[in-house]
């Protein structure tokens, strides 16, 4: 049985992420979506919210599990008995960082391969960061995320605007 691990912050989970999970699920016996705690980033959603969102969107795939992790990816991959790390590449700009990370992971986990996947054409431009910014400014994100994710984003963005904008501006 080959287990693939697809790690990320998934803040929020987008249609592009789901596209990669769906395609990875067709290639591997099991796919573990590993949602990172991300101390270095300041996530919009808490780790529990990101896990719940991912489970709502991905729950219908029988061979996909969603788990959170903290610490080194290598430890999480070992805990999951992972043989492959799946990473998405949207553009050439993603490649340099992902290439360096794959090299480091190869040194830390020589028995595990990194597989790069490009999103389907209609999702190549989607970025969780950009989706969050659009939502925070009150824009329509329905083309980039699933309806359940959009509801989460709208509620969180409303809170953000109420806390960040002067009265009468949001």
UniProtKB/Swiss-Prot annotation:
Main location: cytoplasm
Catalytic reaction equation(s): (R)-4'-phosphopantetheine + ATP + H(+) = 3'-dephospho-CoA + diphosphate
Any Gene Ontology CC annotation: cytoplasm
Membrane-crossing residue ranges in chain numbering: none
A Pfam family reported for this protein in Swiss-Prot or TrEMBL: CTP_transf_like
Swiss-Prot/TrEMBL cofactor(s): Mg(2+)
Site (Transition state stabilizer): 17
Ligand binding (ATP): 9-10, 17, 88-90, 98, 123-129
Protein location: Cytoplasm
Pathway connected to this protein: Cofactor biosynthesis; coenzyme A biosynthesis; CoA from (R)-pantothenate: step 4/5
Binding site for substrate: 9, 41, 73, 87
Entry EC no(s): 2.7.7.3
GO biological process: coenzyme A biosynthetic process
Record Gene3D superfamilies: HUPs
Protein purpose: Reversibly transfers an adenylyl group from ATP to 4'-phosphopantetheine, yielding dephospho-CoA (dPCoA) and pyrophosphate.
Family stated for the protein in its record: Belongs to the bacterial CoaD family.
Assembly description: Homohexamer.
Protein name in UniProt: Phosphopantetheine adenylyltransferase
Species the sequence originates in: Bordetella petrii (strain ATCC BAA-461 / DSM 12804 / CCUG 43448)
